[in-house]
């Protein structure tokens, strides 16, 4: 079996560690794993071929965008940093996943809104992202159509998605030099 996280096992420690107590990593494996590895690996190999650059010399930013989205910086043909984390919830907003948010929002929803851990998890994974912002759909084609018809929330969802992808790509471009 090939695990979808395998490509990202080359990330340096400073890019996969979270700024949490070290024992959460050493004893419990809490770290950035990344996802869509098979896709990013394929893009890396194909870019190497198309650009006629040996894979071990290739520096690119790979974007896997859609209902599930991730961005990966590939340095010398290996995953250097990726936007998804311990779970696929992290990173840029997606169809129904929120992407990166202030972690205290979880506690706020539990203590101030009375949501259980399971309810918060469902909100963040299944009711957020471009679908949650737009109130229309997790399908970007539907959002484009709704935006073209004047739906401001659909346009906002698209604008938010584009902004987070741009800032992630820009940060990764700086990482690659």
Describe each region flagged by the PLM.
Residues 34-42, 69, 100-104, 115, ...:
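Conserved active-site and cofactor/substrate-binding residues in soluble primary-metabolism enzymes
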Residues 3-8, 127:
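Short glycine-enriched loops at secondary-structure junctions
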Residues 122, 129-133, 140-175:
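Adenine-nucleotide phosphate-binding core of ATP-dependent small-molecule kinases
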Residues 109-136:
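Oxyanion-binding "anion nests"
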Residues 47-54, 169-177:
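Phosphate/pyrophosphate-binding loops at sites that engage ATP/ADP/AMP, CoA/4′-phosphopantetheine
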Residues 50-57, 112-119, 146-153:
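Short, glycine- and charge-enriched coil/turn segments that flank and shape catalytic ligand pockets
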Residues 7-110:
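Glycine-rich phosphate-binding loop of actin/hexokinase-like ATP-binding domains
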